[in-house]
Amino acid sequence: MPTKITVKKKNHAMMIVDSEPSVLNELTDFFTFYVPGYKFMPAYKNKVWDGKIRLYNSQTRELYAGLYAYVKEFANAEGRDYELELEHDAYYGYIDEQTDPDLSFIDDLVLNDNKGDSIKPRDYQLKAIDYALRNKRGMLISPTASGKSLIIYILLHWYLSNNNKRALIIVPTTSLVEQMYSDFAAYSQNDKSFNIDEVQRIYSGMPKKSEMPSVIISTWQSIYKLPGAWFEQFGCVFGDEAHNFKAKSLTSILTKLRDAEYRFGTTGTLDGTQTHKLVLEGLFGPAYYVTTTKDLMDKNQLAQLDIKVLLLKYKDEYC
């Protein structure tokens, strides 16, 4: 008879995974990994930390909700005789709930770029939007110049039209706050259903409005120390260029956003990240590869890459 592993949603940030003690030990090992560059960190050198991050807490039975797919992978692995049992939470529902989004609203959007020219979302953008809304979360991986901000704008547009809670967009730098805001201003210049005045920018040096708007764009540095009560107003969160966030700060913010049902991360790459891939997927959801630079170049949607190698030979006395 298979051993049961019960999974229940604690909130939109965390889930409770419970089973027999021996299984929990396996789960702990499964969700444990070394931090890149841990050998050079003071805590490791001083022998107060072993260099590992343990995502599963066997004491509280808590695990990031975005890692449910990995729990399924663990349970269904060859050689294991485990059975997943999903428990319902009266407020948060089941961990694997999906929706069937109606994307017909996109046809009615009047979108413009920064030059004022009319634009339409591309096929790969529409597929990414469908995936994200269907799962209510996702880590969208798409290269530079692929239109990530347009994907965010359309997802945000849908969310504001179907929900009452506010939306939070987190970026790593102040320049990206302004870039995101200017992109939204361009997209919505002929979109009567989106009011750019309802978008507030928060970063060091910019005063906070007394009345909270529908959308806030902020650097993570400006908000990660705020109390948990401040984050309760948000039902949706976006993390743009999420790979540039510091793991501890990002984790602090996303776990405080326990009532944010919709969680979307975007990034161009998961290589050389400051935050481990499993942490990002745990906080936002499973990785989804939107498109590639090669595909965009093949379709002439991106300038062709021309590589020229310059080989410089120096005399020995200069080397």
Each model region followed by its residue ranges:
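Post-DEXD/H (motif II) to motif III coupling segment of the RecA-like Helicase ATP-binding lobe
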Residues: 235-236, 243-308
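Post-Walker A helix-loop "phosphate-sensing" segment adjacent to the P-loop in P-loop NTPases
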Residues: 159-166, 188-192, 261, 288
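N-terminal accessory nucleic-acid engagement/regulatory domains that precede
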Residues: 1-90
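Inter-Walker segment of RecA-like/P-loop motor cores
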Residues: 185-228
